């Protein structure tokens, strides 16, 4: 399925008869407006394998909440997009890729997250994802990162080194069950606003090196390192 021109957030009813047979969606040189919450979810697109959103105007998108929730999708490319009406209107990405258990290729370099406040469980249980580069993510407005990467059990490399976390209050379960991740650099994290870090690194048995240079204690830190049995280098 190829889409271009003006793409509204409400899907045409005429699509309903063939949604269940669509495997690939390409949106190119289009203008997207409104809320795309649950737009590509697995219950509506049961055989969807890939989505590409490229060279589009995304400045009118307000939400990607649960956009790919529980999808069998394998590849998502969102890159080289334009935001001519700055600032971005996108405020919600919670559960965006949650339960995308087959997702193995993800490029979000063209997603403007500068206004996003809620990243709750954004990548939760992306169990096939091995690498995730979020070095270009603007998280300056984010307040909630609860369980953001929880259950990413195949993740070997995660780059969150440029995250601005100065407004984040919730980090509980953020990296829980990232079971083969060996190194994590959070030296740039500002945790001065964080109230809850409970179980943040729980059940990360392969984690050996953890950089927490700028961390400050939160009010709640219960079980923060529970199950981090290989932790050898902790830099604080």
Model-derived regions: residue spans:
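Short, well-ordered alpha-helices that flank and scaffold nucleotide-derived cofactor binding pockets
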Residues: 41, 66-69
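Structural signature of tandem-repeat unit edges
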Residues: 1-6, 19-32, 45-62, 71-91, ...
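Acidic, Ser/Thr
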Residues: 41-43, 202, 226
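Register-specific detector for alpha-helical tandem repeat solenoids, activating on a conserved position
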Residues: 37, 65-66, 94-95, 120-121, ...
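Extracellular beta-strand-rich solenoid/capping regions of secreted or surface-exposed proteins
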Residues: 10-18, 29-41
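Small/polar residue-rich beta-strand/coil "junction" motifs that cap repeat-based extracellular fibers
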Residues: 14, 224-225
């Amino acid at each position: 399925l190829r889409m271009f021109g003006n793409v509204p957030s409400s899907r045409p009813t005429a699509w309903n008869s063939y949604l269940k047979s669509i495997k690939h969606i390409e949106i190119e040189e289009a203008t997207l407006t409104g809320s795309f919450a649950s737009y590509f979810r697995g219950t509506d697109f049961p055989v969807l394998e890939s989505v590409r959103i490229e060279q589009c105007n995304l400045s009118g998108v307000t939400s990607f909440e649960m956009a790919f929730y529980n999808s069998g999708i394998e590849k998502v490319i969102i890159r080289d997009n334009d935001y001519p009406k700055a600032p971005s209107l996108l405020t919600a990405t919670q559960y965006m890729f949650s339960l995308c258990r087959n997702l193995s290729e993800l490029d979000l370099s063209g997603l403007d997250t500068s206004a996003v406040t809620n990243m709750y469980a954004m990548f939760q249980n992306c169990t096939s994802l091995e690498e995730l580069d979020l070095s270009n993510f603007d998280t300056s407005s984010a307040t909630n990162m609860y369980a953001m990467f929880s259950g990413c059990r195949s993740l070997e490399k995660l780059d969150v080194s440029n995250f601005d976390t100065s407004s984040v209050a919730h980090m509980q379960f953020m990296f829980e069950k990232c079971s083969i991740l060996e190194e994590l650099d959070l030296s740039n994290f500002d945790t001065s606003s964080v109230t809850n870090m409970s179980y943040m690194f729980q059940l990360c048995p392969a984690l050996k090196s953890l950089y927490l240079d700028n961390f400050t204690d939160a009010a709640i830190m219960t079980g923060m390192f529970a199950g981090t049995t290989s932790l050898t280098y902790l830099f604080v």
